[in-house]
């Protein structure tokens, strides 16, 4: 039977359309991001903060409908509990490697971050820590190790300068919890005091541990030296009870510390011993007026979603996920081997500030934000550079 040309063309077009409709849409490409942080123990509130921040980023990325290599991406979060323990951290790292994650946001504690970083490096999986500050982490020479916070060198030096220059401290006591984070930070602070050469000096150096609850022995020794400032290298779970015992012993010294103490939980942990302008602490990152609105909006979204305020690290975890996504888009691939060069060269304006990495994986031009506590609230004082 003869079919007119126009009819034949129409039938062909209809058949082609039917065939196209019959073809299933390309399956979404799953990109799995792991988080590793303490979800149990005394640091669980900080570790959950990291997971929550990363999850917000994952949801935002899925809402964008990002396409790589012609396939829509499905972003998936795999959170793991490292219990702030080096051995558990190493086991978690291997679990994430075996799960074939494309990237890892973690760990929180320096003591878990360093051993885990070797496992990620051997597997070629990029890692961005939203919290670990020990210089050792990025001094190992691993091309997969990055962080979006300042390291102890900057934090310790900056806090020493502030304690001497602004708080006018002459006699300073130093305590650390013997963890990689706490000891490293305290050592750098002590070096900063010595380097200042302004007549200020460390008059007492004491040690505790990250699970301690009784500090009377070391605080009694410190009280005998009548310091102006006590520097503590460690986390809020220890700093809170320590402040209570400082008050009970009549210690008038101000407490200075790093980001581990700069949490929203400190008022609960320290009670009325927190006082006003008694505690000074810094967190990594520093946003100017132009970026302040973005950070405030993130904090408000977090509060609305989780019915609690940001502790410390959620914005850094959020930025870490977004930095990974930006590098993958630049490389048009979620394969770690392909996007790693783009990650090393990334430039990103995040909620915590400008992010770019130096050859070691540290932040370029890192800034710190100084806080104190007044009437049970954390109050921003200034950005330090």
Name each region found by the language model.
Residues 1-32, 98, 385:
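Short, low-complexity disordered leader/linker segments with a strong preference
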Residues 91, 134-136, 143-250, 287-297:
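Extracellular/periplasmic Venus flytrap/periplasmic-binding protein
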Residues 34-55, 80-86, 108-111, 175-183, ...:
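Extracytoplasmic "Venus flytrap"
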Residues 243-318, 334, 374-385:
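Extracellular/periplasmic periplasmic-binding protein-like sensory domains
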Residues 96-108, 128-130, 171-176, 226-235, ...:
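Periplasmic-binding protein-like
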Residues 301-314, 323-380:
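Segments of small-molecule ligand-sensing domains
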Residues 46-69, 188-195:
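Short, polar/charged alpha-helical segment
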Residues 24-25, 30, 45-52, 67-142, ...:
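Beta-alpha junction/loop-to-helix N-cap segments that form part of ligand/metal-binding clefts
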């Amino acid at each position: 039977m003869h079919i007119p040309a126009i009819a034949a063309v129409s039938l062909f077009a209809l058949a082609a359309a039917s065939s196209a409709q019959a073809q299933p849409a390309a399956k979404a490409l799953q990109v799995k991001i792991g988080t590793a942080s303490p979800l149990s123990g005394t640091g669980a509130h900080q570790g959950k903060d990291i997971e929550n921040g990363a999850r917000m980023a994952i949801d935002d990325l899925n809402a964008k409908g990002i396409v790589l290599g012609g396939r829509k991406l499905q972003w998936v979060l795999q959170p793991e509990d490292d219990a702030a323990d080096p051995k558990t951290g190493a086991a978690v790292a291997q679990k994430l490697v075996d799960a074939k994650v494309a990237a890892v946001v973690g760990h929180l504690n320096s003591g878990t971050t360093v051993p885990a970083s070797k496992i990620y490096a051997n597997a070629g999986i990029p890692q961005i820590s939203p919290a670990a500050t020990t210089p050792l982490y990025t001094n190992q020479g691993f091309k997969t190790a990055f962080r979006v916070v300042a390291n102890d060198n900057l934090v310790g030096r900056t806090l020493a300068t502030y304690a001497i220059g602004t708080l006018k401290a002459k006699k300073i006591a130093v305590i650390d919890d013997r963890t990689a984070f706490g000891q490293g930070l305290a050592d750098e602070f002590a070096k900063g005091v010595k380097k200042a050469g302004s007549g200020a000096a460390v008059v007492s150096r004491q040690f505790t541990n990250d699970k301690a609850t009784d500090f009377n022995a070391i605080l009694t020794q410190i009280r005998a030296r009548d310091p102006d400032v006590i520097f503590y290298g460690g986390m809020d779970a220890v700093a809170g009870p320590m402040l209570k015992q400082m008050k009970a012993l009549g210690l008038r010294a101000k407490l200075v510390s790093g980001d581990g103490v700069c949490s929203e939980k400190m008022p609960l942990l320290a009670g009325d011993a927190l006082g006003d302008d008694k505690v000074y602490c810094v967190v990594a990152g520093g946003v100017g007026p132009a970026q302040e609105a973005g950070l405030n909006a993130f904090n408000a979204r977090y509060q609305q979603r989780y019915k609690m305020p940001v502790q410390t690290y959620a914005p850094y975890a959020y930025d870490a996920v977004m930095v990974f996504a930006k590098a993958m888009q630049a490389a048009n691939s979620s394969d770690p081997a392909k996007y790693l060069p783009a990650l090393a060269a990334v430039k990103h304006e995040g909620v915590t500030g400008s992010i770019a990495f130096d050859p070691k994986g540290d932040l370029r031009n890192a800034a710190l934000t100084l806080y104190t506590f007044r009437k049970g609230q954390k109050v921003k004082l200034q950005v330090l550079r």
